[in-house]
């Protein structure tokens, strides 16, 4: 799997806002890199089918060089919402699914999610459940996981008593599948930004 190497001393300087969504409320805060309004505190969508053309980069993307470098690495993805999530010590995001594809009628409407760990700790447990089978995954800094947020239950457990977990969360068009995405998934390389 591809692993990205980058600096993260900028993370703790960001000002996050709590999510109000039912599945993340009181357990996760965020700041937007790309949103519908262009605001760093706009985390949601107004249309059931997210069109990448309706989303714009926020000041976070334009002003923090390291954020831009990480997001630009994924230029092969047609993204909609892009956020950085923050999970404090001892916070738990329960397993849940999202309704991202409830209104999808064609492949063009279908969206997937990629989560990239911005830091790592053995106490940051990414949890996934598909067809009744649960898996706990420890992502190293710079590693990513791609999944269907409607079909795969997903959550997170931050068992650390002192460390905060940060992750880049991107929603993107599943089709057409870009050759660089296939290479990203299948190669076992380290990319230094």
Predicted features along the sequence, with ranges:
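Intrinsic-disorder/low-complexity, polar/charged segments enriched in Ser/Thr/Lys/Arg/Asp/Glu/Gln
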Residues: 1, 111-113, 167
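Structured loops at beta-to-helix junctions and adjacent beta-edge loops in soluble globular domains
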Residues: 32-36, 46, 85-87, 119, ...
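Compositionally biased, intrinsically disordered low-complexity segments
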Residues: 7-9, 34-36, 109, 118, ...
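General structural signal for secondary-structure boundaries
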Residues: 3-11, 113-115, 120, 143, ...
């Amino acid at each position: 799997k591809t692993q990205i190497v980058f600096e993260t001393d900028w993370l703790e300087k960001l000002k996050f806002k709590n999510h109000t969504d039912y599945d993340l409320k009181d357990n996760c805060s965020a700041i937007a890199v790309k949103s519908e309004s262009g605001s760093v505190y706009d985390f949601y969508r107004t249309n059931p089918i997210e069109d990448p053309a309706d989303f714009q980069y926020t000041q976070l993307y334009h002003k923090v060089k390291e954020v831009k470098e990480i997001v630009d690495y994924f230029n092969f993805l047609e993204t909609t919402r892009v956020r950085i999530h923050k999970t404090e010590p001892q916070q738990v995001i329960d397993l849940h699914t999202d309704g991202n594809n409830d209104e999808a009628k064609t492949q063009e409407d279908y969206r997937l999610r990629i989560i990239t760990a911005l830091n790592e700790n053995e106490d940051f447990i990414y949890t996934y459940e598909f067809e009744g089978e649960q898996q706990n995954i420890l992502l190293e800094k710079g590693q990513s996981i791609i999944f269907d947020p409607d079909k795969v239950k997903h959550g997170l457990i931050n068992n650390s008593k002192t460390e905060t977990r940060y992750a880049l969360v991107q929603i993107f068009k599943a089709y057409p599948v870009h050759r660089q995405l296939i290479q990203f998934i299948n190669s076992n390389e380290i990319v230094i930004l």
